A protein has these predicted regions:
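Flexible, solvent-exposed loop/hinge segments and secondary-structure transition points
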Residues: 1-131
């Protein structure tokens, strides 16, 4: 089963609250278990490119069923570069996305962009705690 729109909306709201409490302006992407977008949100003042980065991080987390930070070292691997080309360069192998897990099943992922990589991941963690 994949993350639902209702769950995605709850995640977005919690992520926005976490970012706002730190005076951060970020974009948040929630993708399903295949890495396809369910919801993407850009806070007022977040940079124009951050939604795409948030989505790319979330895609990596969902596709590999682990935090995107765990994939950062593999970004230069020829297989990963080919996979990224197959996905039109949308994959972002950097910290800031976490899988959405229910039981033992990955239902999707949340990606955040616009703050430091650690802050992005912390916002994602706070959002997942809302589920």
């Amino acid at each position: 089963m994949s993350v639902t729109l209702r769950q995605a909306q709850k995640i977005l709201k919690a992520a926005e609250a976490s970012a706002a409490s730190q005076s951060l302006k970020v974009s948040i992407a929630v993708v399903d278990n295949r890495g396809d977008p369910v919801a993407i949100y850009r806070m007022d003042g977040a940079r124009h490119f951050t939604p795409d980065i948030a989505r790319g991080k979330a895609m990596v987390s969902a596709m590999f069923q682990q935090p995107s930070a765990a994939m950062a070292e593999r970004a230069t691997n020829p297989v990963m570069q080919t996979l990224n080309q197959m996905n039109l360069g949308r994959l972002v192998f950097g910290q800031g996305a976490l899988p959405i897990v229910k039981g033992n099943e990955v239902q999707g992922a949340i990606g955040v962009s616009g703050a430091t990589s650690q802050q992005d991941e912390d916002i994602a963690k706070a959002a997942l705690a809302s589920l």
